Amino acid sequence: VRVVDLHVRSTSTAKARIDAIKSDLVRLPLQMNLSAERHFAMVYCDGVSASEGFLMQAWYASARFPCLAVGGSAGGTMDMKATYIGTREGVLREKALVIFCEMARGMSFAPFKSQNYEATEHSWLVAEADPVARTVKSVFDRHHQPIPIIDALCQHFHCNKDQLASRLDGFTFGVRVGSEFFTPTTVDGEAPSTK
């Protein structure tokens, strides 16, 4: 079991955060020789820290772990102000917990992915975003012009800004990479500004 600092407060750019996490991963002590055949890593990441992508970029950039990483984000309390991951040493915040697992000889494993989401017919291409703050400022409209995300959502749902939060009820946002969808933790339940 290893704890990885997500460098939420000590870095201000995506590159700086990835580099800091990678540096920690390179120095992470291991007590086993990892292999893709017998090992996997269970990863629990502070979802409110908006660092899942940074952690995995650093993970692969370190080229240190030749095994499958499985797991996900711990969401936190309903107000989405903090995530608390419990360990024997105490409660973790702004950290990831990595558990390296070894299968018994002769045993195997296979990952599966399950999400309870269905894609809608409408999507937007992000024009401007901040991956550190996990905010979207603008998307491209059908004329390929950037417009504020809130305006795009209001146009889509035929509502004004005051009605938007209620119109978004039952929906979540996802990012498509190839044929896979990734659904980041939403930050709050209030009417969105740029989040």
Regions found by a protein language model. Give the residues of each.
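Small-residue-enriched flexible segments
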Residues: 1-195
